[in-house]
């Protein structure tokens, strides 16, 4: 006789991974509950990560545009805005996103349970509700999509009012004139752009020898130059020895002997999976040192009926990929296998000012692989559309095989890079000879557009062949 479960599946977390899994499951007729520890759905992506930081970036970039465009300003008076002012814009976007995503669950009759969950056994969860009561619920299968949080080393006092992580920085209530950002990964670089755009002095501490080393070096160098040109001080190959919180700021002692003082510190060096409260030891699952779970190609953990998606499984730790992982896991959970899979070349969008976006191989990778490739480039300053809107800083680079003309990688630096990249990605994904740089020469683009950069870059690259 089949077992009677409360639900066919329970999804822990309502971020992109949890939402993708939940929507995929209910569309296939499963009885699903989603557990969310906070009062609103959306997870860290909506409330502390992707959405608010990109909303902040947009507001700051518009201020920069106003102050530098003679159409709006004669430079005699600069537009300034407080951090609290631009946070209001982020709050409005968060509220819109929350209402929209809440509607997804309601329309699809997917139950939302609020509280903190942990495993009692392999098919039972305890749910600690916000009113203090504890409920138990059973399910045949589970999807862990509880996301991640900023990594907190034990020797940094995050309770100090001038020491922030990438979550708490959204509660900044004073106006810093100088900020230290420790960690020059994606989050650190994005916030360096935001603060410098607000005319705040920025010391960016990088524990490696160059910014965002996973990028094509030309893109990384472009960002480094742009930071230097805007006044960001980058300190490479540095690690902190000690961090002191003071009444009026923070002092950072570096292992190299240097000392830095600023009004506040943003610690942005790594993230940890939110698995420590799930009591995974009760079901025999283990995580790595960063709280992340190992999964197979169908996102199953060591327990076949327990799946995991999103930041909690590590790379690529992208909201876009997490949603697809959830959708694929839902298909595998219901049907026993998944016909869908993540694409091999996942685009990366980095929302610095200007943006950076990449898909496919870098020049360094192709050189190491001994692939005979050529490069086609288009400078934004030569495009009519860029001249019209004042977006002269930027470049599009296409890497393609010299013999087959197959596109191997696309890299873009400049405003709207994260949008522009998808044109090339669509061609890269074509099968049966459809992936060719000659497409951009043989098609007709609207004029004037930023998309025209592809035709310019394609012609530039093809003209290099002999």
From Swiss-Prot:
Name the domain of life. Bacteria
The positions annotated for binding FAD are: 36-45
Q: Where is the signal peptide?
A: none
Q: Which reaction does it catalyse?
A: NAD(+) + NADPH = NADH + NADP(+)
Q: Where is it predominantly found? A: cytoplasm
Record-linked Gene3D superfamilies = 3.30.390.30, FAD/NAD(P)-binding domain
What does the record note about the cofactor?
Binds 1 FAD per subunit.
Cofactors needed by this protein, per the record, are: FAD
Q: Which GO terms describe its cellular component?
A: cytosol
Pfam families the UniProt entry points to? Pyr_redox_2, Pyr_redox_dim
What biological-process terms (Gene Ontology) are attached? 2-oxoglutarate metabolic process; NADP metabolic process
The protein's location, in the record's own words, is: Cytoplasm
Q: Name one GO molecular function term.
A: flavin adenine dinucleotide binding
Question: What are the EC numbers?
Answer: 1.6.1.1
**InterPro entries xref list:** Class-I_Pyr_Nuc-Dis_Oxidored, FAD/NAD-bd_sf, FAD/NAD-binding_dom, FAD/NAD-linked_Rdtase_dimer_sf, Pyr_nuc-diS_OxRdtase, Pyr_nucl-diS_OxRdtase_dimer, STH_gammaproteobact
Q: What class of enzyme is it?
A: oxidoreductase
The protein's UniProt keywords, in alphabetical order, are:
Cytoplasm, FAD, Flavoprotein, NAD, NADP, Oxidoreductase
Q: Which family does it belong to?
A: Belongs to the class-I pyridine nucleotide-disulfide oxidoreductase family.
Which purpose does this protein serve, as stated in its record? Conversion of NADPH, generated by peripheral catabolic pathways, to NADH, which can enter the respiratory chain for energy generation.
* Name of protein: Soluble pyridine nucleotide transhydrogenase
């Amino acid at each position: 006789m089949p077992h009677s479960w409360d639900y066919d599946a329970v999804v822990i977390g309502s971020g992109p991974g949890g939402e993708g899994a939940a929507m995929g499951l209910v569309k296939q007729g499963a009885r699903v509950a989603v557990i969310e520890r906070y009062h609103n759905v959306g997870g860290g992506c909506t409330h502390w990560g992707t959405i608010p930081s990109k909303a902040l970036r947009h507001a700051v970039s518009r201020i920069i545009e106003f102050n530098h465009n003679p159409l709006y300003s004669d430079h005699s008076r600069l537009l300034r805005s407080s951090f609290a002012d631009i946070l209001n814009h982020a709050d409005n976007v968060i509220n819109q996103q929350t209402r929209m995503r809440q509607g997804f669950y309601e329309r699809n009759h997917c139950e939302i349970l609020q509280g903190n969950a942990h495993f009692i056994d392999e098919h039972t969860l305890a749910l600690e509700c916000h009113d203090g009561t504890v409920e138990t619920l059973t399910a045949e299968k589970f999807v862990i999509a509880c996301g991640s949080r900023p990594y907190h080393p034990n020797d940094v006092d995050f309770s100090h009012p001038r020491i922030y992580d990438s979550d708490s920085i959204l509660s900044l209530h004073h106006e810093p004139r100088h900020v230290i950002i420790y960690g020059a990964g994606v989050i650190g670089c994005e916030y360096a752009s935001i603060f410098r755009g607000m005319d705040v002095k920025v010391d960016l501490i990088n524990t490696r020898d160059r910014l965002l080393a996973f990028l094509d070096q030309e893109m990384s160098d472009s960002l480094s130059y742009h930071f230097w040109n805007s006044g960001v001080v980058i300190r490479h190959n540095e690690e902190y020895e000690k961090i002191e919180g003071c009444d009026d700021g923070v002092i950072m002692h570096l292992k190299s002997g240097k000392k830095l003082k600023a009004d506040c510190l943003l610690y942005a060096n790594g993230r940890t999976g939110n698995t420590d409260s799930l009591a995974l030891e009760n079901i025999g699952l283990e995580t790595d040192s960063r709280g992340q779970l190992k999964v197979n190609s169908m996102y199953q953990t060591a327990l076949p009926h327990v799946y995991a998606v999103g930041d909690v499984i590590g790379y690529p730790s992208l909201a876009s990929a997490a949603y697809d992982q959830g959708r694929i896991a839902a298909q595998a959970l219901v049907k026993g296998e998944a016909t869908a899979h993540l694409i091999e070349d996942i685009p990366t969008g980095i929302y610095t000012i200007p943006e950076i976006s990449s898909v496919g191989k870098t020049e360094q990778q192709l050189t190491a692989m001994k692939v005979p490739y050529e490069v086609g480039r288009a400078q934004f300053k030569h495009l009519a559309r860029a001249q019209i809107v004042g977006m002269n800083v930027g470049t599009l680079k296409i890497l393609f095989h010299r013999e087959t003309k197959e596109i191997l990688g696309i890299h873009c630096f400049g405003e709207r890079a994260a949008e522009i990249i998808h044109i090339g990605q669509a061609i890269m994904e074509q099968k049966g000879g459809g992936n060719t740089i000659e497409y951009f020469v043989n098609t007709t683009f609207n004029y004037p557009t930023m998309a025209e950069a592809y035709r310019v870059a394609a012609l530039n690259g093809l003209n290099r062949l002999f």
